[in-house]
Structure formats: C-alpha cells, structure tokens
Curated annotation (Swiss-Prot):
Residues 227-685 are annotated as: Stem. This is CD44 antigen. Residues 709-727 are annotated as: Required for interaction with EZR, MSN and RDX and for the co-localization to microvilli. Residues 251-270, 427-437 have a biased composition (Low complexity). It comes from Mus musculus. The lineage of its organism: Eukaryota, Metazoa, Chordata, Craniata, Vertebrata. The gene is Cd44. SUPFAM superfamilies: C-type lectin-like (SSF56436). The modification Phosphoserine is found at residues 708, 733, 742. One of its GO terms (cellular component) is lamellipodium membrane. Residues 638-648 have a biased composition (Basic and acidic residues).
Length: 778
C-alpha cells in the first residue's frame, strides 16, 4: 500500500511537470514585406529545427538574406537575434549600443547551430508594405495536447489546441532555454561556459619535512553588468577551535573592498595538495574543521574599452530600445558583445585592502608565514632612496612593485628580508601584523637561529649595505595574528626621543610626518628568538622622514639608513603603555641593518633579541646589542628604566615591570640573550562563561538546600491569637483584659510540641523559654 501511494505521489508530480510544458506563447510582430519576428515563451527558446516547423505552422518559411534586406528597407528592425535561412541575424536601422553591437543593417551573428534564438518568418501572401493586422490562427498546426497562444503586437491573444513541432528533441526540450543568447545587450548576458578560463599559478610552499609545490587555481569568471554595486567584498572567515584553547586564535571576519564596481572578477580558490591537508585535519575534525575560503575580487582593465553601467533589471526590447540610445558603444569588433563574450569592463584599477589570513593549526610543525590558504600578495620594493638633507635626517623612498615571493626557511636563507609585503596605498586600509613564533618554536621542537648565525648574516648584510645602499630592500609582513604586536611598546619603534605619535582612528591617508628633534635618538630593536622579522608600526606620509642615530650623520656612500614603511593608522604611546593593541597596517622588516655613529665612526650592528613577554599588556623587555660602546637613549622619556653596561657590550631597555621576564647577558660575546618564558594561554571566553554558570548553579542549589530545612539557631515565632481571634474552647467575649492575653499566651506555649528542644538551640535560649513559662504561671 505504501508503494502504491509512493507511485501515486510521483505520478502527480510528473503530471504537474508535464502540464507546465503544455503551454506555448508565440509573440508575433507586424509584417514588413512579409517578414515578421516570432518569439516563443520569452526570449531565445527556439532551435533551428523548431524555427522551420514554426514558420511552417504560420504558412510561412524562413526568410532569405534578400528578403530580410527588403524588410529592413521597409522599416523592419528588432533587437532580437533570430534564425533566417542559413544565418542568425538582427535587422537594425538605427545604431544602438545594446543591439547588434551598435551596427546597422542586417547584422549577422557567427554562432553554432545548437544555440537557441528567436526566429524570423516570411509570408509570401502578406502585403508588400507594413502590415500590423492581428494573427488569429496557426493554419498548418496539427492535433496535439499543447495550448498554443498567439500574442499580437496590440495585445490581442488567440489560443488553440494543437502541435507544430515535428522533431522529438524539440518537444522534449521545449522548456530548455540556452543561456548563450541575448538581444545584444551587455546587461543581459551571462558568461558562456566556453569562456571560463582555468589558470594555474605555481607557488613554492616549503614545509618542514617536504618541499613541494601547490597550485592556486584561479578561475576567471565574468559577472554580468547587471551587478550595480559600489564594491565587491570578499570575506574570509576562519574558525579554529583548537587554537581557542591556547587563546591564540579567534573567529575573525575580514572584508576587502575595492572602490569601484566591475563586470569581471578574479576568483582565486586555493587548492592545496591532499598530502598537506592530511596533516592539518587528522585532529581538527574532532572539534570543527577550519574553514578558509579566499576570493579576491578585482576589476580587470582592458585597453580600448569604455566604462558603462546600466541600471539593474533593464531589459531592452522593441519598446524601450530607443530609450537607451544614449549608451556608448562597447566595442567595434563586429561581434556582439552580449552573444559571445563580454568585451567591456570597468577600466579602473581598484585599491584592494589586502588582508591575509594565516590559518595555522598546532599540528603544523614548521614555521609557516605564508599559508597556501591565503590570498596572493604583492610586494613593494623600496628603491632609489634619495636623501633630502643632512639636517632634516630624512629620506624619500619610491615604492616599486615587484613579484611576490614566499620564503619560509629563513634559517638557511638570510640574504633577503623574509616577509611578503602588501603594496602600501594612500587610501586603502592594510592590516599587517607579525605572527609570533614563540608557540611555533615551542611545539616544533626547533631552535631559533643562534646569535652567531645572526652575526654572520648581519656581516653579509652590512657588506651589501656598504656597497649599494640605494638598492636597499624593505619589505612588509602581512599576516593576521595580532597577538604579538599587542605586546609591543612604542619603545621598540624606530622613533627618536621627542617624537610623539598620534592616535587617529580614521581612514585618511594623510598623516603627519615624524620630524626629528635637535638630538634625535632612534631605537632599532630586533628579536632573537623570533624567526621572522620584527613588527614595527610607523605612520604614513608621502615623504617618509625619520631620525638617524646620535646626531648629524655624515653624507657618504657607506652610511646605510633604514626607512620607515607607511601605515594608515597610528597608535599613541599612551595607549601602548596602557596595554592596548597597536593598530598596524604595515610592519617593517629590519634585520641586520648597520648604522654609523658620527662621533666614533664605528659600525654598530643590531643583533636580533627577544622581548621578554610578561603577563601584563604593554610590558616588554627588549635588549639592544651593538658592536661598539655607544649611548642609545630611550624613545619615551620618563617611561623607561634603562641601564647601560660600562663595558659597552650590551644595553637592556625595560619598559614596565618585570613580572615574568628574566634576561641573562653574556658580556664576552657582546650579545645579550633574553630568555622569554612561555606565555600562559589565555582562558577562552566560553570557558569563563561555563564556569560562571556552574558557580551560579552551585550557589542556587546550596540556597535551596538550606531553605528547605530549619536553619541552625532560628527561633520559632509566637503569633498571638494566630490572627483568627479565637482560642481553643473559649470565645473572645468570655476573656477580657490582661487575663485574656495571659491565657492566650499560656495556651500557645502549652501547644508547643513536647519533644526535646532543637539540637541547635543553645542553653541560653532554653533558659529564656523556661523563664517565660515561670512568669506566665505566676
């Protein structure tokens, strides 16, 4: 029985579908020299074989090219592609950007025979001029279950039962409409499947145990110009429940917004090898897999095209085609823009807030600064550094784009700065922070570079800097985790004493340029245990001016200086001292830079050291180690606790109170190493909420348990008369005065249970009750 009802339900569904296919509407235009246009069930649902059958049903034939030209001369024009004998054409008299690619005459579309269009028919018995009389019959149709409705130009409708199709494939596919068709309008055209390009971009992704390549599959897909939005946003969402136990990851959502709309978009879908995914997902599936989907929406620019945007939902037809004559032409290729491809794009270059997302699980055992599941980044090369003057202590740098690079094994390759950088923009926001690696080093079981290795690398960098300082390369690191930079204090930023930083929460690209004081001092502090470069937040300006060390520098070729990369927001030193996070947009990689001191002419090399991270925000201990005995002052007066070794081998600058940081210096080697303890993981919010709920439930349970029984030491209340004004076997009228009250009290006391007093009742309370009884008896 169940099977019967099941088949009945399926039969009813199929019947509804079949009934939906039994309705055909044929829109017919006026006849011009016998040629007219027929549209079935909306636009472009007629195949070539069905077109011949349809014209035959109207007692007509497919027109030839000569007949179409004759009808064109009589005033016949449409904005619909239709079949004629051997071609698909649009007759146009007036040029229109959305019809036949702004062409006039009988425009021929080069297409395949499998596409669906409208059709043109020629009736030899029609008048030689224009004829707009209503068509009331389909004379050559035969019997069939289909309801055929003829819709004339004036709105009159005539229906009949029958069929005109002779090919079974046309009957079966009666409702299939080809998407590869349109009226010639770019606002109606969707991208044909044949024009989706698949591009594979190889990118090196070395890991700890293997050096393999992964490919990012970039699908170039076009979006119809009906999308009339001001920006395309790509959201990246990362949910990592494993790292939430360590307080090192949160569910974040970033949005990157280009400034203009576009008709084409580059969708980048990273595809990592299965071999890498196995190491990431073998444990994370127990909680919740990490989701990282990246889509970079940009607008492409084609030379020789013009910008055009049409209103959403605008569908040109014969009634409104004259209203759109003001739209310019998209291309002059001779092929309709809407049929085969979209040749028009918004000719703009958007500024994209390139925010990357480093999705690293604790199962990844190697430092990874560029996860394959993040967007491609662009790099900025700071070249041709021109010094303005020696008195201003400033430099102008010009950013030049260069191809992105991903360098991860920085223990072996220290010749170049190890970071990918995002192109700085004057108006776009670029959030870039430095991923802390204390957790990675702890779990990887891998030691950071030793001071000797850093010293060797620094010597190589010093030599290259002395030889060619204009080609000095500064890169920026663009990553998501801001947990490390939250602990940085302005004392680690390259700003001299007397510099003040402004806290300005705005998207404006114009920020004040840091001007040095009379005796500027600059700190260049680097990290020893960190395998990546130090994150330094600096303000943005069109000409970056910064201070040099200890007085006026000498203008010579051997004096390399470090520049400051731009950022769109700035953080005040006051906020940093309070422990607030520093809003950074770009971070600077300063590894192994060499500077000279004018008084001693000695090269001081900055060795990377590790800030000792404490439990209190804003308290960071950093160590600056140099080769010579120099005096380096703190950048924040009155807010530092600095000490200088008399031997001049190291200098330790401590900001805040040392709660968890302990530093030990090796005076012989000249390098101060700071042992940064492992930071205790932060307690997740959900765990705090759960503990609070449990504590509240426990308190509530205790209160209920206590209230359910008599409390220890609680006295019973004696209610005179019990509120009802009667005493046992006596009426109130019989009792009067003090005797009545005394008898009532005696009665209530005598009605107390004769059992022993409560175990919690004290001896004093028992004595008081006995004295009350004695007084009442007397």
């Amino acid at each position: 029985m169940d099977k019967f009802w099941w088949h009945t339900a399926w039969g009813l569904c199929l019947l509804q579908l079949s009934l939906a296919h039994q309705q055909i509407d044929l829109n017919v235009t006026c006849r011009y020299a016998g040629v007219f246009h027929v549209e079935k069930n909306g636009r472009y649902s007629i195949s070539r074989t069905e077109a011949a059958d349809l014209c035959q049903a109207f007692n007509s034939t497919l027109p030839t090219m000569d007949q179409m030209k004759l009808a064109l001369s009589k005033g016949f024009e449409t904005c619909r592609y239709g079949f004629i004998e051997g071609n698909v054409v649009i007759p146009r008299i007036h040029p229109n950007a959305i019809c036949a690619a702004n062409h006039t005459g009988v425009y021929i579309l080069v297409t395949s025979n499998t596409s669906h269009y409208d059709t043109y028919c020629f009736n030899a018995s029609a008048p030689p001029e224009e004829d707009c009389t209503s068509v009331t019959d389909l004379p050559n149709s035969f019997d069939g279950p289909v309801t055929i409705t003829i819709v004339n130009r004036d709105g009159t409708r005539y229906s009949k039962k029958g069929e005109y199709r002779t090919h079974q494939e046309d009957i079966d596919a009666s409702n299939i409409i080809d998407d590869d068709v349109s009226s010639g309008s770019t606002i109606e055209k969707s991208t044909p499947e044949g024009y989706i390009l698949h591009t594979y971009l190889p990118t090196e992704q070395p890991t700890g145990d293997q050096d393999d390549s992964f490919f990012i599959r970039s699908t170039l897909a076009t979006i119809a110009s009906t999308v009339h939005s001001k920006s395309h946003a790509a959201a990246q969402k990362q949910n990592n429940w494993i790292w939430s136990w360590f307080g090192n990851s949160q569910s974040t959502t970033q949005t990157q917004e280009p400034t203009t709309s576009a008709t084409t978009a580059l969708m980048t879908t990273p595809e990592t090898p299965p071999k890498r995914q196995e190491a990431q997902n073998w444990f994370s599936w127990l909680f919740q897999p990490s989701e990282s989907k990246s889509h970079l929406h940009t607008t492409t620019k084609m030379p020789g095209t013009e910008s055009n945007t049409n209103p959403t939902g605008w569908e040109p037809n014969e009634e409104n085609e004259d209203e759109t004559d003001t739209y310019p032409s998209f291309s002059g290729s001779g092929i309709d823009d809407d049929e085969d491809f979209i040749s028009s794009t918004i000719a703009t270059t958007p500024r994209v807030s390139a925010r990357t997302e480093d999705n690293q699980d604790w199962t990844q055992w190697k430092p990874n600064h560029s996860n394959p599941e993040v967007l491609l980044q662009t790099t900025t090369r700071m070249a041709d550094i021109d010094r303005i003057s020696t008195s201003a202590h400033g430099e102008n740098w010009t950013p030049e784009p260069q191809p992105p690079f991903n360098n991860h094994e920085y223990q072996d390759e220290e010749e170049t700065p190890h970071a990918t950088s995002t192109t700085p923009n004057s108006t776009a926001e670029a959030a870039a922070t430095q991923q802390e690696t204390w957790f990675q080093n702890g779990w990887q079981g891998k030691n950071p570079p030793t001071p000797s290795e850093d010293s060797h690398v620094t010597e190589g960098t010093t030599a290259s800097a002395h030889n060619n300082h204009p080609s000095q390369r500064i890169t920026t690191q663009s990553q998501e985790d801001v947990s490390w930079t939250d602990f940085f204090d302005p004392i680690s930023h390259p700003m001299g004493q007397g510099h003040q930083t402004e806290s300005k929460d705005t998207d404006s690209s114009h920020s004040t340029t840091l001007q040095p004081t009379a005796a500027p001092n600059t700190h260049l502090v680097e990290d020893l245990n960190r395998t990546g470069p130090l994150s330094v937040t600096t303000p943005q300006s069109h000409s970056q001016n910064f201070s040099t060390l200890h007085g006026e520098p000498e203008e010579d070729e051997n004096y390399p200086t470090t520049s400051i990369l731009p950022s769109s927001t700035k953080s005040s030193a006051k906020d940093a001292r309070r422990g607030g996070s520093l809003p950074t947009d770009t971070t600077t990689s300063v590894e192994g830079y060499t500077f000279q001191y004018p008084d001693t002419m000695e090269n001081g090399t900055l060795f990377p050291v590790t800030p000792a991270k404490t439990e209190v925000f804003g308290e960071t201990e950093v160590t600056l180690a140099t080769d010579s005995n120099v005096n380096v002052d703190g950048s924040l007066p009155g807010d530092r606790d600095s000490s200088k070794d008399s031997r001049g081998s190291s200098r330790t600058v401590t900001h805040g109170s040392e709660l968890a940081g302990h530093s030990s210096a090796n005076q012989d080697s000249g390098v101060t190493t700071t042992s940064g303890p492992m930071r205790r993981p932060q307690i997740p919010e959900w765990l705090i909420i759960l503990a609070s709920l449990l504590a509240l439930a426990l308190i509530l349970a205790v209160c209920i348990a206590v209230n359910s029984r008599r409390r220890c030491g609680q006295k019973k209340k004696l209610v005179i008369n019990g509120g009802n004004g009667t005493v046992e076997d006596r009426k109130p009228s019989e009792l009067n005065g003090e005797a009545s009250k005394s008898q009532e009290m005696v009665h209530l006391v005598n009605k107390e249970p004769s059992e022993t007093p409560d175990q919690c009742m004290t001896a004093d309370e028992t004595r008081n009750l006995q004295s009350v009884d004695m007084k009442i008896g007397v």
